[in-house]
Amino acid sequence: MAVQLDARPPVRPAHRTTRPSRGARLSRFDATYSPYLYVAPFFLVFGVFGIYPLVYTFWVSLHDWDLLGAEHPFVGLDNYSQLLADPDFWHSVVNTLGIFVISTVPQLLAALWLANLLNRQLRARTTWRMAVLIPNVTSTAAVAIVFAVLFGRDFGMINWLLDHVGISAIDWKANRFAAWVAISTMVDWRWTGYNALIFLAAMQAIPRDLYESAAIDGAGRARQFWSITVPLLKPTIIFAVIISTIGGLQLFTEPRMFNSGTNAIRGGPLRESQTVTMYMFENAFAPHYNFGYGSAIAWLLFALIALVAAVNVLLLRRLGGARKGDPR
């Protein structure tokens, strides 16, 4: 039998690469770029109403920008150097920080306690949870008018109560620290319930198994609160602190409405409760109309808010300790 030694295996024909169809290319393009198109409107709106005003305000702060004048000469950093040497500006900074500390610390502590109370098995829980939000949806002007009457010097209810315990009447608008306390009380009344609902929403996400295990081990409610609830609420507490910092350092309506009269924007005759935003309004608009100087105040306020918020976050992380998995 003859054997063919030079036989070779059959060669397969070369595989022809086919171009993806038009539909496949469109599908790949959609999967790759459509998420960016979906979020593009947000960044567009943020750029128009967020980034552009911020940049434009900085540009204006470099000019002697009189709102009633036609020319706006470039002055560089003169507005900032003048502002840093302005005693009225630093007076308003101290007022802002004082009101912020007096209002924010009790506010967040009360909100945390209130949220823990609302997280229990109460009758008509939905009604109570809705009720704590009523002060926040009330008109700020109406709240300010009511509190201005409560803290009135001659016929206010607070002085009437103080008189019954042997304390002489306090002029809440003429005394600097007293004005801080009055305005802080107004701010706390409006925003404690709002922060309580934020904490409550975070508490609802904590697994109930942790509390049941702690109860089996003999931990009481107080121990469960400090050992389970507070550590797991750390990201939410940081969020609430940042939001409260932004709002507290931009305080305007409450002190403005509390100090009604001819010196309202000045926070009283001796600027007892004038905040940075009120001082910015006084310079940028009536009576000075110096928009460049007011823009410089706005930028320094922005820097102050960023600094205080960063310090708050660092302190909370340092006091609470860094746990694995915490957002940074």
Enumerate the predicted regions with their spans.
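Cytosolic juxtamembrane amphipathic/interface segments immediately preceding
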Residues: 22-27, 31
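Short, intrinsically disordered terminal tails adjacent to the first/last structured region
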Residues: 1-19, 328
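Acidic/proline-rich low-complexity IDRs
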Residues: 4-7, 11, 25, 166, ...
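A structural signal for multi-pass alpha-helical bundles of membrane permease subunits
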Residues: 31-328
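Short, charged N-terminal extramembrane segments
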Residues: 18-21, 278
